[in-house]
């Protein structure tokens, strides 16, 4: 498996966006989850959390494991939601407050928007970068 080379990663995102655009009329969070999860072999979790009172609850996901839900606001997702900033965690074992739902998760990216957080975990260390950030923001804008 291993990390994707930047040019392959860009190409994969472009294909994913094309597929998602073709589904625009019936676009749902489940379709986005399934489309992207299927295209990136390293990912072991792709999901959307929604803010409910003082916690985040899973709304839609595709995963190797059942997700943790609800989760507190101290983990990566909660910090991303509260700061309204994208967070890239190269090594989740070194992130204070990381909530471990799957022991195979090695790195993570979170993208907050509206009352939600997109959370993606990878089996590879340092798997997320500016390419992921760029294309995931584009996908969020399509919702």
For the regions a protein language model found, what residue spans apply to each?
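Intrinsically disordered, low-complexity terminal regulatory regions
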Residues: 1-67
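Juxtadomain coupling helices with adjacent low-complexity linkers
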Residues: 2-5, 9, 13, 17-21, ...
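Short loop/turn motifs at secondary-structure junctions and domain boundaries
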Residues: 40, 99-105
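Regulatory sensory and allosteric helical modules in signal-transduction proteins
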Residues: 51-101, 129
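Histidine-centered metal-chelating micro-motifs
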Residues: 87, 108, 125
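A short, aliphatic-rich beta-strand micro-motif
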Residues: 106-114
């Amino acid at each position: 498996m291993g990390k994707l080379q930047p040019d392959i990663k860009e190409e994969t995102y472009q294909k994913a966006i094309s597929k998602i655009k073709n589904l625009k009329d019936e676009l749902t969070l489940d379709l986005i989850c399934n489309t992207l999860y299927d295209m990136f072999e390293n990912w072991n979790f792709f999901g959307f959390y929604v803010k409910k009172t003082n916690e985040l609850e899973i709304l839609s996901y595709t995963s190797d494991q059942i997700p943790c839900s609800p989760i507190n606001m101290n983990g990566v997702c909660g910090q991303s939601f509260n700061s309204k900033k994208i967070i890239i965690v190269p090594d989740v074992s070194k992130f204070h407050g990381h909530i471990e739902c799957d022991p195979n998760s090695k790195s993570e990216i979170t993208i907050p928007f509206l009352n939600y957080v997109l959370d993606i975990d990878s089996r590879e260390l340092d798997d997320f970068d500016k390419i992921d950030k760029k294309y995931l923001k584009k996908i969020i804008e399509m919702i």
